[in-house]
């Protein structure tokens, strides 16, 4: 299977727009609670429902990448996402809204499909750049969704915001049907057999286990720092409202600008080298944040560095996973992202209690510790290919993963 010209860019836009729907509703949760007669405490379950749907999508839908044609698979899942958004826009109570957001979350998992399809649909020596471009779209969707969602909800109401989102997703579905290939991969066994082998992939592939551990550490840190930031800035002496806090996401959004470059570096050097450097950058950002939140410019610099490091490491990690066995790219990505997002959920869950008990200092130190541990593991866990010394580079460069990658067939 080969992607047409512009196919990777289309997948990147699709991934960003789809994944944004898991987060865009969050600034409007107060309005939704009032309109549906739901308590403030209960309305937070909408976010949980979206996450549950997304995790289910990773587990049960993402392995279909190894079995179905990209055109039909991506289009079908985008139509599922559109249906979930329309159902949410028409919901009159909490129950229908939660059902709708489970569907929305499952549909939004198409973002991970886009990454796997992009990695499979280009030559091996361009895999990192392709995955990096899709990761940039996903990161932009996550970081800008709350800002844009809040602005749309203010302008046209939360139901109108969901209808606009549904229209954008439907446009992506049309683009996917028009541009993505209709070539079906050769399946290996039945669908249920594919699901049954998912736990065994962790036992079989050491590279997958390492990717899961490292990725879980930095996504735990990423999720923790953003929730902790929101909680702390809403408290005295800052007392910022949701709109003002949302502006900090613009600083974090600077980080995804590094992703396309990082993807190309991942094709030139080993993923391990990119991850080591990325974690060093993220740890510097976390160290800046440890200084406190009293200076907004310094906080913005810390967030930008932390996000750039985490996003770049994620692109390299996903490219490494897809390179383990491209024929099982969907299944491998499904296992990885399932555990990756579970780690993020843990980070989000512990953020508020950590801030309330230990303050911002405790939260930022935990973030720094997780990033340093992820970087230390990347240094200690040598890639299997590191012993090769392609292109005449020194053995020392190969040992640390900075030897140029050999072109893949």
Residue ranges, per PLM feature:
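Helix-breaking motifs and short loop linkers at transmembrane-helix boundaries and internal kinks
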Residues: 37, 69, 90-95, 292-293
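Conserved MFS/SLC helix-loop-helix module at the cytosolic interface between two early adjacent transmembrane helices
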Residues: 56-92
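Helix-to-loop junctions at the C-terminal end of transmembrane segments
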Residues: 57-69, 258-271, 355
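Primarily marks hydrophobic transmembrane alpha-helices of the MFS/SLC 12-helix fold
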Residues: 71-74, 97, 275
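Cytoplasmic helix-loop-helix junction between adjacent transmembrane helices
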Residues: 101-138
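Helix-loop-helix hairpin linking two adjacent transmembrane segments in secondary transporters
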Residues: 133-178
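Juxtamembrane intracellular "pre-TM" segments in multi-pass secondary transporters
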Residues: 181-213, 403
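C-terminal transmembrane helical hairpin of 12-TM major facilitator-type secondary transporters
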Residues: 272-315
């Amino acid at each position: 299977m080969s992607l047409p010209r512009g196919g990777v860019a289309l997948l990147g836009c699709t991934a960003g727009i789809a994944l944004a729907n898991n987060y865009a509703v969050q600034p409007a949760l107060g309005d939704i609670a009032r309109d549906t007669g739901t308590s403030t405490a209960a309305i937070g379950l909408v976010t949980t429902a979206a996450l549950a749907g997304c995790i289910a999508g990773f587990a049960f839908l993402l392995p279909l990448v190894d079995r179905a044609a990209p055109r039909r698979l991506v289009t079908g899942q985008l139509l599922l996402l559109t249906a979930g958004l329309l159902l949410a826009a028409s919901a009159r109570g909490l129950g229908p809204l939660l059902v709708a957001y489970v569907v929305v979350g499952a549909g939004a998992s198409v973002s991970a499909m886009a990454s796997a399809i992009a990695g499979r649909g280009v030559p091996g020596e361009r895999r990192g750049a392709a995955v990096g471009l899709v990761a940039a779209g996903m990161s932009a969707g996550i970081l800008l969704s709350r800002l844009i969602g809040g602005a749309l909800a203010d302008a046209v109401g939360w139901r109108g915001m969901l209808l606009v989102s549904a229209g954008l997703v439907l446009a992506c579905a049309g683009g996917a049907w028009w541009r993505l290939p209709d070539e079906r991969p050769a399946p290996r066994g039945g669908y249920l057999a594919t699901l049954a082998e998912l736990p065994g992939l962790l036992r079989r592939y050491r590279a997958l286990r390492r990717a899961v551990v490292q990725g879980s550490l930095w996504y735990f840190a990423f999720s923790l720092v953003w929730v902790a930031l929101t909680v702390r800035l809403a408290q005295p002496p800052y007392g910022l409202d949701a709109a003002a806090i949302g502006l900090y996401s613009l600083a974090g959004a600077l980080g995804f600008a590094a992703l396309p470059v990082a993807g190309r570096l991942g094709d030139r050097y080993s993923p391990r080298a990119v991850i080591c450097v990325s974690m060093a950058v993220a740890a510097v950002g976390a160290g800046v944040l440890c200084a406190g939140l009293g200076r907004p410019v310094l906080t913005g610099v810390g967030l930008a560095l932390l996000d750039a490091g985490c996003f770049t490491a994620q692109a390299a990690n996903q490219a490494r996973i897809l390179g383990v066995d491209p024929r099982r790219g969907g299944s491998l990505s499904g296992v990885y992202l399932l555990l990756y997002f579970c780690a993020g959920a843990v980070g989000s869950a512990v953020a508020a209690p950590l801030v309330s008990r230990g303050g911002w200092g405790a939260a930022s130190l935990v973030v720094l510790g997780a990033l340093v541990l992820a970087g230390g593991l990347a240094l200690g866990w040598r890639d299997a290919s590191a012993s090769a010394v392609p292109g005449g580079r020194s053995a020392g460069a190969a040992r640390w993963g900075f030897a140029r990658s050999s072109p893949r067939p």
